[in-house]
Amino acid sequence: MSFKKLTRPNYASVTALVSATTAALLIVSGVTLPDVTHAQSPDASDWGFYGGDAFGQHFSSLDQIKRENVGQLTVAWTYRTGELGEGFERNSKLTFEATPVLAFGLLYLETATNIVIALDPETGIQKWRYDPKIDRKRHYSDVAGRGVSVWEDTDPKRQGACARRVFVGTLDARLIALDAGSGQPCADFGTTGQVDLTGNVRIRDRDDYEVTSPPAIVGDTVVVGSSVGDNRAVDVERGVIRAFDARTGTQRWSFDPIPDNSAHPAAAEWNLSQATTTGAANSWGVMSVDEEHGYVLIPTGSASPDFYGGKRLGSNRFANSLLAIDAANGKLVWNQQLVHHDLWDFDLAAQPALVDIELQGIPVPAVIQATKTGMLYVFDRVKGQPLFPITEKPVPRSTVPGEEASPTQPFSSIPSLVSQRKLNPDDAWGVTFWDRGKCRELIASHRNEGIFTPPDTRGSILSPSYIGGINWGGIAIDESRQRIFAAVNHLPMVVTLISPETLEQQAKSDDYPHSDFARQSGTPYAVRREPLLSPWGLPCTAPPWGTLVSVDLRRNRIVWQVPLGSTESIGPWFAPTRNFGTPHMGGPIATAGDLVFVGAAMDSYFRAFDLETGRELWKYRLPAGGQATPMTYRAGPEHRQYVVIAAGGHGTLGTQRGDYVVAFALPKGAKTVPSGVN
């Protein structure tokens, strides 16, 4: 594996009591948490949602495994899915990103090809398996599936088969309901257990319209977004968000982030004649649910295409936004746009994280949105006001004809987790004087004015870039400590707008061995992308290239940041094998055992860190890349705690391919330290 594999980065991808004055006080005096608010992991033995709970906190109250004994962790069981992409046209893009969920006594997961599997949580023995039989010859934009969602019918008259259901979205845009006990399709849902999501959506290319994340469930309503292929054209599929009856599959409502008439609430911030032919602004990541208020919190991505906006002038409101939608009727409650007129592929990829904060003695329901820019934004999740001030700051202007970059962007007052400053030639890094010199030349030859430097015909350095910052792995939160944990990328990319006439010539040329090309049909420019690498294939910027970071919201500061990943098996043979941190995909979880677990890095290690200090306490070399977010649960008569991660590799990162699900636990009979004893 090498950094050069990153040349195909297609990541398609709150109360009225809080006034601006109160928000300002928050920064001065800090915030405190009530002793008891939302219960993190209501049933400590379950991880019943992709994010642990409906709030997406990626936190477990289990503490059998803790910093005092985590070094004893051993493999409890390993399951192999058998899915390695045989016969798949886009085999090179196959990524096993699933986070299992535990419900109804079984562990449920999906493969990259949407095969749903139920396992015994104690042994890893397969209980059932369902294959939706997607067409493997199609050229899907992404080949990934992050997980499934589960639902239980509370109607006492409907307690037979399919009273408990598993919902999964597919690469060919179906929403499928399965009986949780048997894996059989629920015949009363849609047509023979499935709903075709391509209905009532403009489809330009069926291979560009997918579902890659688990749906959100609010009561008996299933809410689903979509993944839309990046950069092929302006008029790609629109990012319509839809809701379906969990029992029948009947559509209840839809919400289109892009206006198609002047009555649309975002119409004033688009060129309306252009908006009707624009696509995307879709929600391809994981949504979160505020069950008390009946809201679904939805992160959206860029309108199409990513790197040229001359055909979608305006701020493109509702794209690159956090939306709060009433799940009962599909009405927008509030929205906050975190990138105006996106030209960088800065989709909101991370799952929103819902927490309860106490301000001036008043509990405030909040939501935290992590971003690819490395900024964290916190809002009152009922009304939408910022709880930490946001300032509109001037950013570099575009010099590309026809483009109108936004003159300002919203900057959070929470410390950024990535550098926002201009990259200078003196910042070049290398293993030798020679490659550092080459990196100096590369940096000097491209446009870079810091964060939000627009794409340019001479090539612009994007730092942070479209892989993050924080990507779909999101954040973990220890609500009692009010601490955030995030895996953060620090790898600049170069984006160059090129003439469509030279696209084929450049794509075939040996002059661009590390580049990825996209047509952006309907615009004057195609696009070329590549990591900012030295001739040796290592980044031109100093390490760390990936970090694990802890943020204290009470004090509004970064507590610690440590490299995530080593250069073991990466780069040229003479490169130092050090804990330099690597680019990664996947996110962390935190536990009451004072631990943060994370895989994600390119070296295929699964790691545990001390939550308080960031010290690495344990690591295990997985049999394949662990580019997924782990989960944990308690099972069996001994109430044994397990930590599970999918290890199947990542096509874009080029990590080792595999089909493993690996569960770790303390050895049976191992001494466990009682909670609270150090």
Question: PLM ranges: what are they?
Answer:
Residues 1-14:
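N-terminal secretory signal peptides that target proteins for export/translocation
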Residues 15-32:
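Bacterial N-terminal signal peptides
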Residues 71-84, 116-138, 152-157, 175-206, ...:
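Extracytoplasmic/lumenal domain signature
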Residues 409, 413-491, 500-503, 547-550:
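Long, low-complexity segments enriched in small/aliphatic residues
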